Amino acid sequence: MDFISRAIALFWIVILSPFFLLIVICSLLIQGRPILFKQKRVGKDFQLFNIFKFRTLSIKNNNNLFIRPNIIKISKWGRFLRNTKLDETPQLFNILFGNMRFIGPRPEIPEYVVNEKFDFLKELKPGLSGYSSIIFRNELEIMSLLKNKDPYDDILKIKIALDKYYQFNKSFIVDLKLVAITLLSLFMPRITGHY
C-alpha cells in the first residue's frame, strides 16, 4: 500500500504541476514570499517531519496555526486556497517522501501530542484526509464559536476519538469510502454539509 500511495502521489504531482506553477505565480504576485508554509508535525512512531502547504496566513501568523481565529489574518487569496483545499496539495510530496498516506489521522504539531493519547501513531501514518479532516473541514469557523482559552483542545479530543475509530475499523474499502467523501466535500459540498 505504501508503494501504491507513493506512485499515485507522483502521478498526481505530474498531472497537477501546471496548477502548482499557476498557484506559485499567483501567490508571488498577491502575497509575496514565502510561497510554502512548512511546519514540524508528528508522524508514525512519533517521528517528526516537515509538512508542506501553500501559505495562506500573514507572515506574522505563519508559524502558529492554532491561535484564536479572530486574530488570524488570511488574505482573500489565502481564503480561496483554504476553501478549495488547494493549500493542502503540496502534501502530495509528503506522501511521495513516505511521511504520509492519502487516508489517515491528520498530523498534529508536537506540542499537542501526548504519547498515550496518540498510541495509534505506532500503527498509522498521518493522512491527507480522513474522518477528522472531513468533519472539521471548516475548522477555523468551528473554533471561532468556542469561547474557552484553547478552543483547539476541544476539537482535538474529538479528532483523537475519530482517529482511534479509524484505527480499529480501517480497511481498503473504508479508505475508498473516505476518498469518495473527501472528493464529494470538495466538489459537491452541499451533499456532505460543507458550505
What is each PLM-predicted segment?
Residues I23-V24, K38-K40, K53, F93-F97, ...:
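Short beta-strand segments
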Residues K125-Y195:
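C-terminal terminal-structure detector
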Residues A9, F37, S75-R79, L162:
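Positions in alpha-helical segments
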